[in-house]
Amino acid sequence: GQVVVFVEIGTDVCLSGINLNECVNSAVQKAYIENYYRKSVVKNSLFCRDNTNTNTPAILYTDFIEGSSVNIKLMVKGAGSENYSAVKMFNPSSSKSDIFEFIKQSLITAGEKSCPPYVLGIGAGGTMDYAALLSKKAFFNNTNTVEEKNFISEMKAYLSDFSSDILDIKLCSSSTHIACLPVALTINCHCTRHAKCSITQAGIVYERANNSFINLDDDSSLAQKCVFADDITAIRALNKGENILLSGEIYTARDAAHKRIVDDFAANGTLPFDMKDKIVFYAGPCPAALNEVIGPVGPTTSSRMDKFCEFMYSHGIVATIGKGERSKAAIDAISACGGKYL
């Protein structure tokens, strides 16, 4: 994911001889390269979508606080949840129910595509861009006012139909123009990856996560059928809802790779590989660490590949693997070709 960093600088602190932006980006680059994390940042959103291969530049916000410490708050945002975040400019006379309904409809749009259960960050106030910033800061806010706590409680009640899909709701509110009521929603997936530390003359104090996990007994309802990737008959015979353990050779490709495949075929009439009876995993693998065959691989939001389904399945793909629901057009294309979606 893309790294978002909030740096709070104490008024008694003097940062001399350093470029804070360069420091942050150097640290992000070092962390992503040395830990073999997946690098997800492209050079320019419109004109050069080549990977920087360093996961930089990070997004940096600075603020000033009282005291002699430097506080660093960091979050890592994946596109699966960020793509379904939203901002709406309400009329000042809008009710709480209007705001709650906006959040509800945004969650309906996100569906399963953003990896529920979710943590929601709500930002209210300022301008359009500031409300969005507040919705990010909300994830670090543990000092809500009584009014904010009541607002969150009422929102949770309004969203009761989503209770199993929401881990928590966080809120930051601020002043705004007399004629404005901007509200922003940032959706975080169940990982909601974030960290904090405070740097003082005495050293660095990290906020530690609670790592006391509960052991769960094996659930027999999750019994898996073993299927091999080259057993096309077994794959085509799979039924909706079956849990399988898939073994064998598969391909990984996300939207950028799909676009290249389609564009190359349109230009040259050839495919980069024989797609017949192949399986494509909608994922971007991380670099392999020493002694690893392949790095960690995480599924991406399948709906981004929906527009390629007809092409891919009609050219021989037998199954795709990803997360989240598919559009009706994608389902129809998969069914028409006798394919599967895992």
Model-assigned labels for residue ranges:
Residues T143-S163, T252-L342:
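Feature captures the catalytic cores and cofactor-binding loops of soluble hydro-lyases/lyases
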Residues G1-C48, Y84-A86, F90-P117, M128-I169:
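Alpha/propeptide regions of enzymes that mature by internal proteolysis
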Residues N142-S220:
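Domain-length cofactor-binding catalytic modules of enzymes
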Residues A237-L238, I244:
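Short, well-ordered loop/turn sites that connect or cap secondary structure elements
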Residues I18-N19, S85-V87, D129-K136, C180-V183, ...:
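Short acidic, glycine/serine/threonine-rich loops at helix termini
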